[in-house]
Amino acid sequence: MKKILSIILITACLACGCSSASGTGKNTSKSTASEPESIDFFAMDTTIKFSAYGDKKVLKGAKKVLTDLEKKVSVTDSGSEIYHINQNGSGTLTGDVSDLMQKALQMCTQTDGALDISIYPIVKAWGFTTGDYQVPDESTIQSLLPMVDYTKVEFDKTTGNVTIPSGMTIDLGSIAKGYAGQQSAQYLRDNGVKSALLNLGGNVQTIGSKPDGSPWKVGIKDPNGDTPMMVLSITDQAVITSGEYERYFEQDGHTYWHIMDPATGHPADSGLCSVTIVGDDGGTCDALSTSLFVMGLEKAADFWGKSNDFEAVFVTDSGEVYITEGLKDKFALTDDHADTTVKVISR
């Protein structure tokens, strides 16, 4: 593991709730109005709030970017491009969906399969796609695992053509929400918005800073509570978290969560209960929050040490908190967690 330095922060600056932000400014132009415009809607299986200093019509356009993408990548919508491929074994992806597929497969390769877009049948067997939770028989899991192998997906990035083996189901959900937030943010930028915060059910994408020049304050949830444990100061980046607390069920005294290990077909038992990724690319952050959770702390820290495009916050099952060195001057513990020891992972 990379070198870890232990520091204790005894002061805190509670700026906002978990994965939310607020800000004001004195400029009254449309792109930096004194109060943000906002819209709330439900998409991608979560409640979404877009807030921006700009015209509300532009926000509605950003919403359309997201909902249009959702329709194209849904595993269950019979009109989606991904659904068509899963039903027919092949098909052609267009535009942003093709771009998303290319990105997803790149992340599968970079994480050595800790992220795998063909994990859907395993997730379904555990009931996380329907809410009918169950612990599947080991024989069921073993029968499904041979089709969990992203390397068997044939994709031509030039034509968008995709072919998958019989019995395989692909799902871009592990990267789609972060990618959608990124695309929506780019739409806002292209339409003159310089200050915004997009909250996709806890996946946060920021544009610029607040109108007064100060960074956005994004809360990181305590995995064992209902309040933020720390607040990050963020400018023009994405902040995306994967945690075992997000979706889980209990059976016979055991807790099972939705983040699956592609190697075992079981919930990832990596010693981590929460991973937050901060970076410029929302899709990358989304993919890494899941895959680094699967890897566990040591492998995740080594992966970070060999990268230069993201920072991370790790919370272990035992309650230890680790941050990578790029965040050491960008966080503050909340009052309720002021005595928490935070260990800094350095290169």
Predicted regions and their residues:
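Mature catalytic core of soluble alpha/beta enzymes
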Residues: 2-11, 15-347
